[in-house]
Amino acid sequence: MNYLIIPAYQPDLNLVKLVRLVHAKSDLNIIVVDDGSDADKKVIFDKFEGLATVLTHEHNQGKGQALKTAYAYILERGTYGSIVTADADGQHKIWDIFRVVKQSQEHPGALILGARAFSGKVPLRSAFGNKLTRFLFKQQTGVAVSDTQTGLRAFTTN
């Protein structure tokens, strides 16, 4: 069983478009984690009935905890397959989501990272953070990656 996890805090209609498109074009089990969004965003999460499983945090706990909540949900089911994470803002193209799923299936045990094409001006804080984490990641693993902060990731559960 393959999963798409989308952590969401204060999402807009881009999330609805993404969920509907992925549901229509794939057999991925979609999990959306509402990470403590305001009450007015409930109308967005209500649109996922029959399309996705919605897990809810009462208060914002951050993207990392939202991912852990979804991982725990999958672990409770005891199923094996691929897990893909994508951002709720619609920045990841659907074919890129499917591409990283395929790569994770072809390379079990590997971490597949989508890489963003940076164009234009990147905020100094973001550029510094990505540069620092790329350096630390390479020091720790010996593997060079171009974008450690990408929200598009895939790996297998086994």
Residue ranges and their predicted role:
Residues 2-11, 18:
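A conserved hydrophobic helix/loop-capping motif in glycosyltransferases and polysaccharide synthases
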Residues 59, 65-73, 94-158:
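Acceptor/aglycone-binding surface of glycosyltransferases and processive sugar-polymer synthases
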Residues 10, 35-39, 61, 70:
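Conserved short acidic donor-positioning loop in nucleotide-sugar-dependent glycosyltransferases
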Residues 80-91:
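Short beta-strand-to-loop acidic/aromatic patch adjacent to the donor-nucleotide binding site
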Residues 20-29:
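Short, acidic, metal-binding catalytic loop of nucleotide-sugar glycosyltransferases
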Residues 34-42, 90-91:
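A conserved acidic beta->alpha catalytic loop
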Residues 14-17, 38-47:
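Acidic helix N-cap motif at the loop->helix transition within catalytic regions
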Residues 45-77:
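Conserved donor nucleotide-binding strand/loop of the catalytic core
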